[in-house]
Amino acid sequence: MRLTTMHSVILMLLLVFAFDNVDGDEPGQTARDVDNRNFMSILRSEGKPVHFLRAIKKRDCTGQACTTGDNCPSECVCNEHHFCTGKCCYFLHA
């Protein structure tokens, strides 16, 4: 069966009107009316972002007290004044 574009459009419109009231309890009520925008309010960002969407930031370790290099976070070194120096410490920024 081969349909032209016009026939396809007419068929789609008829199907839309035929199934328009499937989810409603009364005539004219559709699934779009039932939602009352609750779905969109859930999607809005409220509070902190989701854990896997947080930005990763590099922190400067300068000024952190240490006794040996083991006390400093990775990629930092303990200098002669017993302070960690260098850029290090990737962490999730809240």
Curated annotation (Swiss-Prot):
It comes from the Eukaryota. The keyword Secreted applies. It is found in: Secreted. GO terms for cellular component: extracellular region. One of its GO terms (molecular function) is toxin activity. Keywords: Cleavage on pair of basic residues, Disulfide bond, Neurotoxin, Secreted, Signal, Toxin. Expressed by the venom duct. Residues 25-59 form a propeptide. Contains 4 disulfide bonds. The keyword Signal applies. Residues 1-24 form the signal peptide. The cysteine framework is C-C-C-C-C-C-CC. Probable neurotoxin. This is Conotoxin Im026. It comes from Conus imperialis. The lineage of its organism: Eukaryota, Metazoa, Spiralia, Lophotrochozoa, Mollusca.
